[in-house]
Amino acid sequence: MTKKKALNPLPYLASIVFLPWGISLSFNKSMEPWVTNWWNTSQSETFLNDIQEKNILEGFIKLEELFLLDEMIKEYPETHIQKLRIGIHKETIQLVRMHNQDHIHIILHFSTNITCFAILSAYSILGNEELIALNSWVQEFLYNLSDTIKAFSILLLTDLCIGFHSPHAWELMIGSFYKDFGFVQNDKIISGLVSTFPVILDTILKYWIFHYLNRVSPSLVVIYHSLNE
């Protein structure tokens, strides 16, 4: 019975990692034709955020410039002008398609994220015993590691999250979050978050090292400070 319980957390952990992703991907693929059809046939209003509005305006400005060019070259042969008008018409259609596709992707990404959140919430509610077993397994695994490996792992993780190059990673993650949920990507807000998050994490880490690790494993704290120096 003990061996069975010890083996339970591994498949449970694998299901937490892969099952929400697989279900969300299947949900995304199955919903895409329906969302595309709904947006192209039933959507009567246009919702634009600042980034999308800017892109649409830039596209139409280019088309307007082509129309002005068309007016300037009326003395050209009729066949040349006809080709130019056909090209402008194709560009307009392509611009509308890109606009629609952006909105469809936002809806699908948002639905996928909600699905993942619902699945993980169900896991946390229905799999309480498995979570307890997984927590015990993780604690036992960490306990069996040497203090040197623990200190090196903490140092590596902190360098990745709050190190010198971490702002670039934070910008990518926050930008991806904004894109997935269709929010307006404000550079000032992102810059403020990138400047704030690492400082908060660094403060929490120092408090954890001082309050918890210094009491549980003083040797680990000594090794960590030695590696950090």
Swiss-Prot record:
What is the organism of origin for this protein? Nuphar advena
What domain of life?
A: Eukaryota
Q: By its UniProt entry, which Pfam families does this protein fall under?
A: CemA
Subcellular localization(s) per the UniProt record? Plastid, Chloroplast inner membrane
- Entry's family note: Belongs to the CemA family.
GO terms of biological process kind: potassium ion transport
Full protein name: Potassium/proton antiporter CemA
> Which keywords does UniProt give here?
Antiport, Chloroplast, Hydrogen ion transport, Ion transport, Membrane, Plastid, Plastid inner membrane, Potassium, Potassium transport, Transmembrane, Transmembrane helix, Transport
Q: Which InterPro entries match?
A: CemA
